[in-house]
Amino acid sequence: MSKTGIPPKGYKAFNISQPHIDNLGPGFYKKEDDDQLVLGFFVKEENLNGYGSAHGGLLMALADFSLATSAMRNSDKPVTTVSFHSEFIRPAPLGSLLEVRAKVTKKGKSLAFSE
């Protein structure tokens, strides 16, 4: 686990700063062969729920940030989440590296759809 901001193997440190994400971070990113952007965060003690795993609000915040980052990659306009649906598959314990992948599936004049 890295609390120092040292990226895990294959990742680079974020070069952007946003108060909410800075509070959750440090965050990392990498690009896969298909140009897919992957964001990474380690689960820290302050991110835990009462059962010792990552709080659902943290997971949703990271997913939302990833979806927005994906939508803005090829746009010069800021984005805001209009609707968000999530399902949790399994707990993420302390020290886990959370990897978040998002892609834009459809773009309109004023809306982008991502998953």
Regions found by a protein language model. Give the residues of each.
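Terminal targeting signals and extreme-terminal segments of soluble enzymes
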Residues: 1-115
